[in-house]
Structure formats: structure tokens, C-alpha cells
Amino acid sequence: GGAVLDGKVYRGHTSNALEIGHTTVDPNGPRCNCGNLGCLEAMSSGTAIAKKGKEAVSTNVETSLKKYDTITSYEVFKEAEAGDEVAKDIIDNALTYLGIGVANAIATFDPEMIIIGGGVSKAGDIVFDTVKKVVNKRCFKSMAESCEIVPAGLGSDAGVVGAVALAIIPPLVVEGALFSDWVYR
């Protein structure tokens, strides 16, 4: 996660600001790779969707996901679109949690835009329509209506490109101090 505030990348006190994916959306949810329980990432990332699909296949429940040797979020989205009820439930759950995370970010920061990247964003309209529906239900009307929710232009490569850009772009000026001076102190 990240934010641009007043034209500057906001990093926070320890340079870990806005890790929205590691905010808790379900205190009883699965353990995230960060160690926390019920993080947004553990509930709605492509990895989380694939994990839920694999769990469904390992049970006695009837699902078209069983025809795949390997299950990624792509297969779960594909079968949900084809009408598989198990896959639809997995996707609906994941996107509802994503919507809750976005609604929390909107309620906290009142941004003019939320950009969603990563693999899940490649699923397209179903992601953005569901997230917007959850945001409209959970945010003040004025905030929900004034915040644009859009896919990242870099798609699933956004994180890698952002990390490389931070490593190679000239030092940023942050409140009168050179960003590189502040980071390397």
C-alpha cells in the first residue's frame, strides 16, 4: 500500500505507512504471513482466494474447481463467472473483505481516488463493482460518491515497479529534508 499526499509519497515515521493489506478485517480470520490474524491480504488476495479454492477441493463439497490440477485465483474467478456456487462464495467473501478494507481507508483518509492493483484487480468489473457496492454501503454517502476507485495502470506489476522506482529515482524532498538523508540516518 501507499499514498501520495500533497504531491509527496507518504512513508510514515518508520517508512511502513499505509500497509492497508495488513490491517485486520476479520479478527477471527486466518493467520497472515505477517503473523497477524485476519489481515485484508489473508482474506482477499489472489493467494487467499487460491487457498480457499484448494480447501474447497479437499472437502466433499461439489464444485467444478475439482477438475483442475492446479488452482489459482484465476480458476476460482473463472468458475465463479460460470456459476459454480462454491467459487462464487469464495469470490464474494474475498471481494466483500476487500470492499471493507477500501471503505476503512476512505473513512480514514477521505481520498479523491483509491487505486487497486495486484493480481485480483485483473479480474476486472466484478472486483470494482463489488468493492464499490461495499463502499457505498459502509461509507458516508458524500465520501463514497466523491472517491474514484480504479485499477492500477501497472496491474499486478505495480508493487515491483514501485519498489524499483523508490530505489532509483532521485531523492525526494520531504518537508524540507532530502528523503535519502532521512532514510539513511
What are these regions, as identified by a protein language model?
Residues 1-4:
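Short beta-strand scaffold segments in enzyme catalytic cores
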